Amino acid sequence: MSVVNFYGQLSNTQQFDQIRINIASPDQVRSWSFGEVTKPETINYRTFKPEKDGLFCARIFGPVKDYECLCGKYKRMKNRGITCEKCGVEVTVSRVRRERMGHIELAAPVAHIWFLKSLPSRISTLLDMTMRDVEKILYFENYVVVDPGLSILQKGELLTEEELQKAKDKYGEDAFTASIGAEVIQQMLKELDFSKLKQELYDELHITSSEVKKKKLVKRLKLVEDFLESENKPEWMIMDVLPVIPPEIRPLVMLDGGRFATSDLNELYRRVINRNNRLKKLIESKAPDIIVRNEKRMLQEAVDALFDNGRRGRAAKNANKRPFKSLSDMLKGKQGRFRQNLLGKRVDYSGRSVIVVGPELKLHQCGLPKKMALELFKPFIYSKLELYGIATTIKAAKRMVEAEKPEVWDVLEEVIREHPVLLNRAPTLHRLGIQAFEPLLIEGKAIQLHPLVCAAFNADFDGDQMAVHIPLSIEAQLEARVFMMSTNNILSPANGRPIIVPDKDIVLGLYYLTIAFDNEVGEGMMFSDLAEMEHALYNKFITIHTKIKYRRDQLNAEGKMVPVIIDTTYGRLMVGELLPSNPNIEFKCINKQLTKKDISLVIDLVYRHCGQKATVIFADQLMKLGFKYACSSGISFGMDDMVVPESKSTHINETQLEIKEFEQQYSNGLITYGEKYNKVVDAWSRCTDRVANDMMKEIATPPINDYPNHQRINAIYMMAISGARGSFQQIKQLGGMRGLMTKSNGQIIQTPIISNFKEGLTEFECFNSANGMRKGQIDTALKTASSGYLTRKLVDVAQDCIITEKDCGTDKGIEVKSVIEGGEIIVPLAEKILGRTAAIDIFHPVTNDLILNKGELINESKLEQIESAGLDRIMIKSVLTCESSTGICSICYGRDLATGTLVSEGEAIGVIAAQSIGEPGTQLTMRTFHIGGAATKGAEVSSVEASYDAKVKIISRNVVINSEERKIVMSRNCELLLLDDNGNEKARHKIPYGARLLVDDGDIVIKTQKLAEWDPYTIPIITEKSGKVLFKDMVEGISIRDVTDEATGIPSKVIIESKQYSRGAELRPRIQLLDSKGEVITLSNGLEARYYLPVGAVLSVEDGIQISVGDIIARIPKESTTTKDITGGLPRVAELVEARRPKDHAVIAEVDGRVEFGKDYKSKRRIIIHPIDGTLSIEYMVPKGKHVVVNEGDFVKKGDLLIDGNPVLQDILKVMGVEVLANYIVKEVQAVYRLQGVKIDDKHIEVIIRQMLQKVEVTDSGGTTLLVGEKIDRHEFDEINEKAMKNGLKPAEAQLILQGITKASLQTRSFISAASFQETTRVLTEAAIAGKVDKLRGLKENVIVGRLVPAGTGYFMDKMRKAAVKLDEENV
């Protein structure tokens, strides 16, 4: 017995390592077949026996009953293998009717519709004709010239019936050959000489210069090469013989009432057979050509309908006008073979029921209803009853179970003991949606679920249902216990934080328990042990909230117990008692008012220092304590708990006065409508916040004087502050003011809702509010589907990402630094590098001690060293730079977030990444602005303040001093840094062009000092020199217009689009500055003082006046930039991972250089960058209306924006490279999730980016057979280059290309995986022509062919099997 079979399952399934797909040749089809189907009949409706030679013929497909021939001459096993001489049926199992195929010999060749109509059409590409033309030939509309002979016709020219007749008359009957139908296409394909054609195409490709032609040639060449490599013959795309699939797969079922229900395929096959037989007769009886041709066309259409109904022309329909389901439809879509039956199967030994809460369960338990358990564990019970001799036979055992005898229950208890069951709640969005528990038998019919796992399942008890599955084999039970037990899933795989955290009531109970009140009974008493305190509590000398002193023994670093005196309360000591004793876990971590966040941190701490078992026990006890005090605290929620602040009316009156002032300014023409709108919205935002803050202050400190009638602490406030339920946003709406609302298009309505829910809304307010709420409801309904689809696409693209080795040995890595936004550090460096590995040795910058070795995992203790060393950026290894040929290595991935240790081999990190990004997707709003319709627009930023005492450093400082002695920033990329004493960056602020700087380089500033200020609503255009204004190209009514505001009657000059006028096409409105002599002033950079004005700019100066340095010439209102829809939430994530071009995308500079504006072209402006290294200048064409953020003469750096907007990802990759691109995508995706408070580890996003960067585009073929412009997998590309270099040839060159996840999934190396994702027919057609081999490396392909997935335990089985094969080969 070979080693392989030892590992093979004890079944007769074939062992194989790869699957190949090819076009079937006519001989192959005949070799599969067990006989020709010649009659369209199915079953004789009187005898119900299959008709001979029909679609269900027993002679061809096998017997209908096991070991029994059709006429009944031979029956039973003893006759197996005999073929009955009377009816011709082989005596065997009826199962063969699922396997045996038949065939139909076609009377005329027929084109396979997949190769004809699946775009790009393979047949027409090979023949170099258009698809339209090929169709005309195939469907008998036109003749094609096969051999021009003596005529002047071209080979391949199409002729209609009349033209053919004329040509025959002109050149004679036999002068040339023209033909029609599939026969001629087959002949033309047969005549193709591929090696010759390949050479011709190569030569043509090198000569041609047209890009379009090149693309076409590359496509054709690729196809020719595919045929050459796969040894497929092109004429096989035209079929002479048609396979008939086994009858059991297209069954005919009898319904009650003597009618039959049949599979659509039978009907489609019948049409083919009928038309084929008719055609045979017509050919035999030498019918006129026109009739034969019509029949051939009908046969072609019948075969088309069988293969892919509706692909061409009208779909064949049944009597009820419903289109027939063809072979293609069987595979396609959610209901197709792939997704319905191969990737999603229904399973036996399962049940489902409603869930109820089980607070007295332990974390690893669930309550299983007795009825359910009895049914699910039936076979186990039978075997045990028989084993113990309680029942003599299985039948007796069955009867006992049905009667529910008492001994059955005892046996059930025993069977169930330590046999884990799986619980699953749909939708299973991440791997924690299925977990294993030990069942406890309970009365009733509902499953009991432990409260702490609800967060992972996203379950609540308002009628949710859950499914139970029983792992049967010992291996399955083992895996369930080791990998899936709820106690082994404490940390979330998405971010490495505990997911088993107390929530809702438990948090509220613990918060209440740990409150310390002032002036409580017995304050300041001293205690030395808990019993004494309990006594005092029982006799009402203290309460659980009294501040007391307590002597407690604590473990020190040496592991000795030392007594310490602490200020605490009895409540906190109760929590403290539950803490496991460990020197790293001090009492102070819980000696405070515990909020949800604090509790989560404590659990994390316990997990890191005391391990999993201690954590589970701790969490369970914490839960019981929390429930107890949530109950005994008697916290309730009443109308009086919503406090309306007294200052509300004052704030509202002040704001209304402010808004009146804006209205006045608007009527006086000082500000535009857009500016007024922005200011009004801002004022109301500020007002709402003020009211909310006052309300919060009042809620947080309730009046103490009338205690005990009044609660010591506000219940609503407690719920929100503890993190139990509700947010301050919601409290604001209950007791403050609802604030601004959004319209359904996302615009903010200027009049806010002044009332809150306690006071009640007016009719008008109610209408406004309902509008926003409806929008929110609709969004929620729509986003669930798109979120699910995004998850599916992510899983598909990353499913073959598996950890395959320990270390790939690369030296590459990526540099990470903390994320700074608006000057605040949002994500500290520590959070970004925790659980990653160092790419280089890392030393202390001052002492030069080694902190981290290359490849060492950065854990919590190393983090402290890095933080104390004050490092602000670090090189870490990343999956993006991993060089494993298949999969990814452990070192590049780092810590497995679910366990907190280095990731093990065989872990399916791709799927985990996809789930981590997709699971929170449903929480992401479609639009970023709604909380129940309330607008959450912050006030516009118009200044920056120092957030620390620090030293100022200004980058690219370009400042002019204006007439008021103020410093005005003239640089487009000025940044202000705040440095600490060691010179480390603490904050970074972008200072916009035109801002007033209030500090200078090197100044020392104190916290909250203002550093710079600017007008947030307009972008100014500012002069660098003093001089006289001269207007150029400003033609009234064509390029500039006096706009009079209807509301105010005040005119202002505005630049307008001039292209609608013929003479306006060349106009470029600008302002020049003249000196005293009337000549144009020269600026510091050597260019003339010219200021181009974009469309929409409002002039602030008159022609001919004198202005000084730093004056504003014109303002560009910013309303045009704020109203454009900011794509947020889920659509933004989808836009990024699909690598789509954003709407209104930015243009980025490709090189460092100076900007010049060239001559305009039609409706486009020309921006030219002259590189500093003197290479060729680069031109950009941008639409005129867009706001260009650079001015003539500005110096730009590579990657700077020339036009505002989101940059195109492909541009970033081309200009800045992979690392910058990856950082950008990670930053943008994280920004969306951060807004919703969702934490996801960067490495998950990096895994997806790696999958998007799998392909390269060849730029130079070198000495290889690759074609320029061909897209190829980067590992394949490296292999080809290695071969070339071994043979002494020049290697090819290529550049990385970024693909969206859908495209990347469809172009994966595995055709099975791609076909089961989308566009099934296209993928299979391509794969068949290329004769692709699927190595079965990913998860999906293996699930589909029914093997263990090569991840987790399956990975090692796979490894062992491969080792076994090797051993066997060596032994042979």
UniProtKB/Swiss-Prot annotation:
Zn(2+) 1 binds at residues 69, 71, 84, 87. One of its GO terms (cellular component) is DNA-directed RNA polymerase complex. GO terms for molecular function: DNA binding; DNA-directed RNA polymerase activity; magnesium ion binding; zinc ion binding. It is an enzyme of class 2 (transferase). Zn(2+) 2 binds at residues 808, 882, 889, 892. Its EC number is 2.7.7.6. It catalyses: RNA(n) + a ribonucleoside 5'-triphosphate = RNA(n+1) + diphosphate. Disulfide bonds: none annotated. Binds 1 Mg(2+) ion per subunit. The keyword Nucleotidyltransferase applies. Pfam families: RNA_pol_Rpb1_1, RNA_pol_Rpb1_2, RNA_pol_Rpb1_3, RNA_pol_Rpb1_4, RNA_pol_Rpb1_5. Keywords: DNA-directed RNA polymerase, Magnesium, Metal-binding, Nucleotidyltransferase, Transcription, Transferase, Zinc. It comes from the Bacteria. GO terms for biological process: DNA-templated transcription. Its cofactor is Mg(2+); Zn(2+). Mg(2+) binds at residues 460, 462, 464. The keyword Zinc applies. PANTHER family: DNA-DIRECTED RNA POLYMERASE, DNA-DIRECTED RNA POLYMERASE SUBUNIT BETA. The RNAP catalytic core consists of 2 alpha, 1 beta, 1 beta' and 1 omega subunit. When a sigma factor is associated with the core the holoenzyme is formed, which can initiate transcription. DNA-dependent RNA polymerase catalyzes the transcription of DNA into RNA using the four ribonucleoside triphosphates as substrates. Belongs to the RNA polymerase beta' chain family. This is DNA-directed RNA polymerase subunit beta'. It comes from Rickettsia typhi (strain ATCC VR-144 / Wilmington). The gene is rpoC.
